[in-house]
């Protein structure tokens, strides 16, 4: 791989109290208090920019001819005549002073090109494809949908020749379901297609599926179904089924799935947008100052062929063994090889019907003298299951898990034979807890997302969900860059925001995995003992023993451990068995076993820095360290947080009652910010300023005016207060049928004089808890400058 160094000229920055931050919309808007002495500031400017070539002058007389020249202004004119910024600033159109900060607004500042010598999407030199996504899993497909809906052209390549039918991930948390609500009814279709919640709300611990029950944990609470904190519920839906629904939406957007043979018609060194090329493996990445060239390998007529694909950005969403990550030499950091397992995918409607009638659940933890395993019931109605079995290579090999051997193990764990058992797939996998040292490289042109950037234990279901949220965070930033409202530095905020979340979710997943191990430990099956024996055999004197003897030692150790699960020992009449069963009961009742839902982390994660404007009243420091226990979500409106959910009524539709979530007010079809205010004069003034500034930045903004709930029949419209601007919506708080309910601003813990600016990904970019005291136009210009990376 060839990395490039593209040294950009110094970007405008605060220098000795002076900041060059934005551009005025009109030359006539030049203003400066003529009685304000700026000689000291001018000397600072002259000193700080003395290395720049003089290119222009600022003439106060043009805008204040009656006042004539002043000595103060002469000094200012001389200082600004030295400010060329290496030729990037052609003309100054406004100078303002606010809180002793001199602001110079050059004409080109609001133009789409970055303040750097190279722009990612610069006209004639633009790459043929704006974005290439490597990996056609849920993360890559969701990203391609989001980008396409936002108007960004992209294509997808994947080394697999077909889409996997292995169920893999299956738990979809609240935040991911909220994102799926944006994808043309995907969340609703998942809710309709998934098994009924009563068939998967529990984890069951037993000696066999037809034997004694050691414990049952119900992971659903009443509030989980009331949609108080989220408009979406969690779901249990296999990954391959989700993939099918995502492909359906991509087809509706004009995408075509092609194999290596079907891609023959494409140009040799290009890929047109809206293509999903299967059987195309990324084998090389070459970066230069203008673009990325990905080399993909594919089979054609039995021969390995290669195709070069030129793009502006490349997103590696190609899973835990990411080729993109390896090609760019990005290291993973964390715990490796927590556990090796074999995953057995099988079908049995007979077993599904039995469990529906006797003990429905999502996960079954089975411990007996013949075997140990975790059974994932992906769909009891269809009889689809995956059995996870501990695996200890090299003493054990995949050949030890033949279909016949797996059938025997399944019968032992079920407690009886099944007449319709069909083993569909057997595959080994390794559990890691790692996060990439960085999510971006090659001047932010190569980006990692999903499992390519972080690998978690499956405990808690954070793997796919974190990846879906990666895509949601990244899509609007790429679109803002492509469409010209943001600078390329906005892409760096993807890593700044998402990597800390990945680290937190890694910690939480490990905590949850340790909690899962507490149950076998209580039964006398300490997993650390098995791992220690395995390490001893592989790394010490045991490694010189014949392979057959090594395997025999390992098998005997495991058999000895499982002997503690015999019915004669594990019962209340046996003192040791009674003690162990009492410990189990304590673990289950105390909520110390494996958990399924984590509302606080699912909905309450917050970006502490990035494309946000922190305020002085936000909680500082690192977020609370995950405990591995369920904590309820508490709504928060601090910058970086997800916008709180509340149902509101759209007042502009007089023909019918339209009730939506506050999350639904954020556009899914374009990069648009949402300003939420109250119907107050000062808030309307802020809205006018925000509209004006957004136009300068070539950004879109919509204003939402939240009216308090009332039945007085008075008209609630903001058209006259917001004219001539038209992109606004009036909404009214919806109270419960009994009249109870909390106001919007109370939920946000803010005054009604406050305001909230929401990003296109439904996270809060900025807020004012109780109004702003500064010039609203200047203030919002600073806000958009920070969010869009134009500092």
Functional labels for PLM-detected ranges:
Residues 259-292:
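A conserved short coil-to-beta-strand element within the FAD-binding core of flavoproteins
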Residues 4, 97, 101, 479-638, ...:
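C-terminal helical "tail/cap" subdomain of flavin- and related membrane-associated enzymes
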Residues 213-218, 340, 344, 358-394, ...:
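Active-site substrate-recognition segment that forms the wall
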Residues 207-239, 298-300, 304-308, 356, ...:
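Conserved FAD/dinucleotide-binding core of flavoprotein oxidoreductases
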């Amino acid at each position: 791989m060839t990395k490039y160094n593209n040294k950009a000229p110094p970007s405008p920055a605060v220098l000795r109290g002076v900041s060059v931050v934005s551009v005025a919309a009109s030359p006539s808007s030049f203003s400066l208090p003529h009685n304000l002495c700026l000689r000291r500031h001018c000397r600072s400017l002259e000193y700080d920019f003395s290395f720049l070539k003089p290119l222009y002058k600022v003439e106060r007389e043009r805008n204040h001819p009656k006042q004539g020249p002043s000595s103060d202004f002469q000094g200012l004119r001389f200082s600004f005549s030295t400010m060329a910024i290496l030729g990037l600033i052609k003309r100054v159109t406004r100078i303002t002073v606010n809180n002793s900060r001199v602001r110079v607004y050059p004409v080109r500042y609001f133009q789409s090109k970055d303040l750097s010598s190279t722009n990612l999407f610069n006209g004639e030199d633009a790459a043929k494809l704006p974005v290439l996504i490597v990996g056609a899993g849920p993360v890559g497909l969701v990203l391609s949908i989001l980008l396409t809906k936002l108007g960004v052209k992209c294509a997808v390549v994947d080394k697999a020749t077909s889409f996997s039918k292995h169920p893999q991930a299956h738990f979809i948390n609240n935040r991911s379901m909220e994102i799926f609500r944006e994808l043309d009814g995907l969340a609703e279709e998942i809710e309709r297609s998934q098994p009924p919640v009563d068939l998967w709300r529990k984890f069951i611990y037993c000696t066999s599926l037809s034997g004694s029950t050691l414990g049952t944990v119900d992971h659903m609470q009443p509030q989980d179904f009331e949609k108080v904190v989220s408009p979406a519920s969690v779901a249990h839906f296999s990954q391959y089924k989700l993939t099918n629904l995502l492909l359906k939406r991509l087809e509706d957007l004009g995408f075509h799935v092609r194999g290596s043979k079907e891609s023959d018609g494409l140009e040799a060194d290009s890929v047109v947008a809206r293509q999903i090329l299967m059987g195309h493996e990324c084998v090389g990445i070459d970066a230069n100052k203008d673009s990325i060239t990905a080399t993909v390998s594919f089979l054609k007529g039995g021969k390995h062929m290669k195709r070069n694909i030129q793009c502006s950005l490349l997103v590696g969403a190609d899973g835990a063994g990411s080729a993109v990550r390896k090609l760019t030499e990005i290291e993973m950091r964390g715990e490796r090889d927590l556990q090796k397992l074999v995953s057995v995918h099988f079908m049995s409607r007979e077993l599904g019907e039995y469990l529906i009638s006797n003990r429905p659940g999502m996960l079954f933890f089975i411990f007996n003298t013949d075997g140990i395993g975790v059974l994932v019931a992906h769909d009891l109605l269809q009889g689809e299951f995956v059995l996870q079995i501990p695996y200890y290579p090299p003493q054990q090999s995949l050949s030890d898990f033949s279909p016949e051997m797996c059938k025997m193990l399944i019968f032992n764990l079920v407690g009886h034979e099944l007449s319709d058992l069909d083993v569909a797939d057997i595959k080994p996998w390794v559990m890691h807890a790692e996060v990439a040292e960085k999510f971006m490289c090659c001047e932010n042109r190569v980006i990692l997302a999903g499992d390519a950037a972080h690998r978690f234990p499956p405990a808690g279901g954070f793997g796919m969900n974190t990846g879906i949220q990666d895509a949601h965070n990244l899509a609007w930033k790429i679109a803002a860059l492509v469409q010209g409202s943001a600078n390329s530095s906005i892409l760096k905020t993807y890593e700044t925001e998402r990597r800390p979340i990945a680290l937190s979710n890694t910690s939480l997943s490990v905590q949850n995995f340790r909690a899962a191990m507490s149950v076998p430990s209580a039964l006398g099956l300490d997993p650390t003992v098995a791992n220690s024996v395995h390490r001893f055999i592989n790394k010490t004197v045991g490694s010189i023993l014949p392979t057959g003897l090594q395997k025999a030692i390992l098998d005997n150790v495991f058999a000895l451990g499982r002997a503690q699960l015999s019915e004669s020992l594990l019962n209340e009449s046996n003192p040791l068995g009674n003690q162990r069963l009492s410990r189990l009961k304590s673990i289950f009742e105390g909520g110390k076993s494996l958990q399924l839902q984590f509302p606080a982390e699912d909905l309450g994660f917050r970006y502490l820095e990035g494309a946000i404007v922190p305020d002085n009243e936000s909680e500082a420091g690192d977020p609370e360290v995950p405990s591995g226990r369920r904590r309820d979500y508490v709504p928060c409106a601090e910058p970086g947080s997800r916008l709180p959910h509340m149902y509101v009524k759209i007042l502009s539709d007089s023909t019918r009652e339209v009730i939506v979530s506050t999350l639904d007010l954020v556009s899914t079809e374009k990069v648009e910010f949402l300003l939420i205010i109250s119907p107050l004069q000062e808030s309307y003034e802020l809205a006018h300023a925000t509209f004006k500034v957004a136009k300068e930045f070539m950004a879109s903004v919509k204003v939402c005016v939240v009216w308090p709930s009332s039945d007085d029949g008075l008209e609630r419209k903001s058209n006259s207060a917001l004219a001539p601007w038209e992109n606004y919506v009036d909404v009214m708080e919806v109270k419960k049928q009994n009249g109870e309910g909390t106001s919007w601003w109370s939920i946000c813990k803010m005054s009604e004089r406050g305001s909230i600016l929401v990003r296109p990904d439904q996270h809060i970019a900025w807020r004012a808890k109780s109004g702003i005291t500064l010039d609203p136009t200047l203030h919002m210009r600073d806000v958009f400058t920070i969010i869009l990376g134009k500092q």
